[in-house]
Amino acid sequence: MKKKIIIIAGEPNSINSEIIAKSWKKINNNLKNRIIIIGNYELIKSQFKILQISIQLHKIEKINDLASKKKLNILDIPLRFKNPFKIIDKDIRKYLFLCFECAHKISKQKI
């Protein structure tokens, strides 16, 4: 099996979700099933809705969960928010730390 490609969703108040969506639409289907986004599922879903982007999402709890071949796979990291583009700095720092910590653990596992 080919190695997975892990991408951190990044700063919630930025344009990262838009970049992820545009890139997702341009890559081929063979590559899509290897990509996993580390971020908050509800946040990305809300941002896509506001930006009027229609990409199907698949929430996964663990890196070894079966990834969907045609949906954007999101490894869910907890984050509380009311407005998906106006999140408090304190919550952002904690969220980004958890995302990087998760990515670091995955890289140590060599998945």
Feature-to-residue mapping (PLM):
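Contiguous, glycine/small-aliphatic-enriched amphipathic segments in soluble metabolic enzymes
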Residues: M1-I111
